[in-house]
UniProtKB/Swiss-Prot annotation:
Record: transit peptide: 1-77
Cofactor binding: number and manner: Binds 2 lipoyl cofactors covalently.
Protein's name in the database: Dihydrolipoyllysine-residue acetyltransferase component of pyruvate dehydrogenase complex, mitochondrial
Organism: Rattus norvegicus (Rat)
Cofactor(s), by name: (R)-lipoate
Function: As part of the pyruvate dehydrogenase complex, catalyzes the transfers of an acetyl group to a lipoic acid moiety. The pyruvate dehydrogenase complex, catalyzes the overall conversion of pyruvate to acetyl-CoA and CO(2), and thereby links cytoplasmic glycolysis and the mitochondrial tricarboxylic acid (TCA) cycle.
N6-acetyllysine found at: K451
Residue ranges of every copy of the Peripheral subunit-binding (PSBD) domain listed in the record: 342-379
One GO biological process term: tricarboxylic acid cycle
Annotated Lipoyl-binding domain residues: 82-158, 208-284
Entry's EC annotation: 2.3.1.12
């Protein structure tokens, strides 16, 4: 009776009387304005903010429909025939879901193909459609209910309209009682479900779209609303940037796909650690509907407020260079407010620079928050005059400088980097192999190629390294593998991750199919990816994945170093600087001066044995010392 509509699903074998239709996003369905993630993000069948969660290519299998349809209709003999619709497991990892929206109301007829409801899972928002005609008798789980366990009954449908009235006061408790025993006078009526609060989304509000925080990467569990690009009341045109969200991987901008108006911002700018599925804002189609949402406050975000940065310890005041009395009398200082200090990031920075104790500043911002104006107008209270009692001169105390350190909040990206690096060092048995490579031939070939490409771009030494690494991975595929706990996955294509340092932290954009690309194409890809990485404009598909990683610190003069493996990859190549060295030669002098580069290969010993790692380095060295062999 039900079917699931989602996208990015390759196959599903329908059961008798049921089939699955997977909707596409190319033609947005009618209704409130849809919002999509940055235009560069591949759709993957996911609507980012308007209920569709990005970040998983996991494909639901036939068991989705089996779980959805596997429970036969449970009928209570004291009630007309009806169908109990349970919440199925719509992804391999789903344990609970959120009723994003009911498309049908109680009493309405449901025709074949009608959309009944949208359920937000841990992977995407999945819509249910009817394959048969029926009537919505009772909605048991209100719209907006979060963390509904899999298997919970969410609604009741009946075949005949005259049966709807029998379920007017239907609850799951009353149904259980009816099936367990014969009819008997109830001791007390069951408590009715709590009515939705006046501030909760409901039918009293105009037609609107509640925008929720989706999963923008496979490992994302929360995000930070870095900046709102639109204000309440502003018109949203197609292509406008709505907001920027900092995930555990990068900062991603959301663009508006259809016209509308921003009616309400539910999560203030700068709010950190916002859980997935939290409503972010409200969008309406008509400008006159904006005023209706002035006091709109869904229950999911009533307690969500911007988190204050870690409190700055009060700076130690400089001790005046006067003799210290034997029994000093503490000067009376005004007691600051107890508890948490709410302060904007800019005000906190200014206070640290000026050495101002935030507990003594009275905030004039929303809910008493300290803002820049409060710091600028703050006048510190004068300390009580020192006692005039004479005291024997004592040793002078060296003044302690104010603001000797600053606490830098940890971004989501930095936190994830720390977690993954710790995981790598604790779970992967690293070992390291080093070799010197004569770069003389590469430098000559590079010089000739750049003359040919003059005005079109330049090929760097790093581009030769990427190409040689990719070809070596084809020759020694064990190094182009991944540890998957139960199997070792050997990849047939080489996607080279290139470590790039950005203000937000280290990120590894990917040169896909590096083994079949020419040097000019690799150079163009690297320049584009590095620029986007430093500007924070990388899309998730551009840095998630990869089969082999290169980290180059040679441009900083580092001779050699050992890099940490990027799981689940098995190897990472650390590139050091080139330096001139004397090498034996068959000439009159008996030696030549060569530009020699030191490289170190970090290997996962579970996947790559020492001999295999040495074999890979030999192939890599051969390609660089005779770059013409890259053409074979």
């Amino acid at each position: 009776m039900w079917r699931v509509c989602a996208r990015r699903v390759q196959s599903a074998v329908p059961r008798a009387g049921f089939r699955a239709r997977w909707a596409t996003l190319k033609g947005p369905r009618t209704g409130p304005a849809a919002v999509r993630c940055g235009s560069g993000i591949p759709s993957y069948g996911v609507r980012s903010l308007c209920g569709w969660s990005y970040g998983s290519a996991t494909v639901p299998r036939n068991r989705i429909l089996q779980q959805l349809l596997g429970s036969p209709s449970r009928r209570s003999y004291s009630l007309p025939p009806h169908q109990k619709v349970p919440l199925p497991s719509l992804s391999p990892t789903m344990q609970a879901g959120t009723i994003a929206r009911w498309e049908k109301k109680e009493g309405e007829k449901i025709s074949e193909g009608d959309l009944i409801a949208e359920v937000e899972t841990d992977k995407a928002t999945v819509g249910f459609e009817s394959l048969e005609e029926c009537y919505m008798a009772k909605i048991l789980v209100p719209e907006g209910t979060r963390d509904v366990p899999v298997g919970s009954i969410i609604c009741i449908t009946v075949e005949k309209p005259q049966d709807i009235e029998a379920f007017k006061n239907y609850t799951l408790d009353s149904a259980t009682a009816a099936t367990q025993a014969a009819p008997a006078p109830a001791a007390a009526p069951a408590a009715a479900p709590a009515a939705p609060s006046a501030s909760a989304p409901g039918s009293s509000y105009p037609v609107h779209m509640q925008i929720v925080l989706p999963a923008l990467s496979p490992t994302m569990t929360m995000g930070t609303v870095q900046r709102w690009e639109k204000k309440v009341g502003e018109k949203l045109s197609e292509g406008d940037l709505l907001a920027e969200i900092e995930t555990d991987k990068a900062t991603i901008g959301f663009e508006v796909q259809e016209e509308g108006y921003l009616a309400k911002i539910l999560v203030p700018e700068g709010t950190r650690d916002v859980p997935l599925g939290t409503p972010l804002c409200i969008i309406v189609e008509k400008q006159e509907d904006i005023a209706a949402f002035a006091d709109y406050r869904p229950t999911e975000v009533t307690s969500l407020k911007p988190q204050a940065p870690p409190p700055v310890p009060p700076p130690v005041a400089a001790v005046p260079p006067i003799p210290q009395p034997l029994a000093p009398t503490p000067s009376a200082a005004p007691a600051g407010p107890k508890g948490r200090v709410f302060v904007s990031p800019l005000a906190k920075k200014l206070a640290a620079e000026k050495g101002i104790d935030l507990t003594q500043v009275k905030g004039t911002g929303p809910e008493g928050r300290i803002i820049k104006k409060d710091i600028d107008s703050f006048v510190p209270t004068k300390a009580a005059p020192a006692a005039a009692a004479a005291a024997p001169p004592g040793p002078r105390v060296a003044p302690t400088p104010a603001g000797v350190f600053i606490d830098i909040p940890i971004s989501n990206i930095r936190r994830v980097i720390a977690q993954r690096l710790m995981q790598s060092k604790q779970t992967i048995p690293h070992y390291y192999l080093s070799v010197d490579v004569n770069m003389g031939e590469v430098l000559l070939v590079r010089k000739e190629l750049n003359k040919m490409l003059e005005g079109k771009g330049k090929i760097s030494v790093n581009d030769f390294i990427i190409k040689a690494s990719a070809l070596a991975c084809l020759k020694v595929p064990e190094a182009n593998s991944s540890w998957m706990d139960t199997v070792i996955r050997q990849n047939h294509v080489v996607d080279v991750s290139v470590a790039v340092s950005t203000p937000a932290g280290l990120i590894t954009p990917i040169v896909f199919n590096a083994h079949i690309k020419g040097l000019e194409t690799i150079a163009s890809d690297v320049v584009s990816l590095a620029s986007k990485a430093r500007e924070g404009k990388l899309q998730p598909h551009e840095f998630q994945g990869g089969t082999f990683t290169i980290s180059n610190l040679g441009m900083f003069g580092i001779k050699n170093f050992s890099a940490i493996i990027n799981p689940p990859q098995a190897c990472i190549l650390a590139i050091g600087a080139s330096e001139d060295k004397l090498i034996p030669a068959d000439n009159e002098k008996g030696f030549d001066v060569a530009s020699v580069m030191s490289v170190t290969l970090s290997c996962d010993h579970r996947v790559v044995d020492g001999a295999v790692g040495a074999q890979w380095l030999a192939e890599f060295k051969k390609y660089l010392e005779k770059p013409v062999t890259m053409l074979l």
